[in-house]
Amino acid sequence: SISENVNTFCVYYIKNNAQLIQPNLSNNLTEELKTKCLNETNLTWQEKDADIIFSGSINDYYIKPMSIQNNETAAQNRLTIKVNITYKNSIDDSQNFKKTFSHYTDFDSSQNFVEIEDELNSIIIANLVEDIFNSALVNW
């Protein structure tokens, strides 16, 4: 839960350090986390010197084949995104953490990845943001 003394938050740009770069991923993840904090808390956005600060980086963005068939082709592929997040709470530093969050989604290997990439990224980002938010502000 959020301490009553915490009034402001900031989400620093989450940079992309993955080998495979998806151009909008950093911006989308940063903005989704900011939006979730604005919509689901009474906290106010503050560009710097906020009571709580999220920062981090995308460290992995990759596709790997899943469920290999008899003809040795994959029926499914898995897109995985891993992010390292640092959470700093200037009011209660016992809440501070550095954690890796990871989510994936599977898709049919017959689908054109380029055509579904944005949709898959949206699904994974929503799950990552939920986990980051819960870990920082719901304390589960």
Placement of each model-derived feature along the sequence:
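Second-shell loop/turn segments in exported
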Residues: K15-Q22, Q111-E119
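A structural "domain/chain start" motif
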Residues: S1-N42, E47, N134-W140
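Surface-exposed short loop/turn segments
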Residues: N39-W45, I53-N96, Y104-D118, A126
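Compositionally biased, intrinsically disordered linkers/stalks adjacent to structured regions
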Residues: E117-W140
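A residue-level signal for beta-strand positions that form part of recognition/binding surfaces
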Residues: T8, D51-I53, K98
